[in-house]
Amino acid sequence: MSVVVDTDIVVALLDTGDANHEAAARWIVTYDDDLVTTPLALAEMDHFARCEGALEALRRDLERGVYTVRWWADALDETLVIARRHDLSLADASLVALADRLRTDRIATFDRARFGALTTRAGMPFTILPDAG
């Protein structure tokens, strides 16, 4: 199975001073499924990692295959439709499109308000990870 990974999870893992660092670190060591993201989210990750002085750590994770980056022929079209429909950034919309493409309802994010208000193509709510508890 796959879980779609949002930028804030990766930033929290890289930045020990991030308010969500401990929660992200506890979650990541218990998770064994494929962690997948999009090039749009990766660009955000790169930007924030650079700002936090963690760019090399992010690049090492990418080289080791910690995260898989997926894109497909009509990804941009799907992303634009979702972004307009839900007033999302292109990065966030691309993650929703990716979840649909992978047929997963699991998104790793600390942005519960935004992703918790969205549903899968089948109309089911996304499972937001890590658990709020």
PLM ranges: what are they?
Residues T16, R64-H86:
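Acidic catalytic patch
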Residues M1-V36, A49-R59, A122-P125, P130-G133:
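Short, well-structured N-terminal submotif of metal-dependent ribonuclease cores
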Residues D8, D46, S89, A93-A97:
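Active-site phosphate/pyrophosphate-handling residues
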Residues V96, L102-G133:
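Acidic, PIN/NYN-like endoribonuclease modules and their adjacent C-terminal/linker elements
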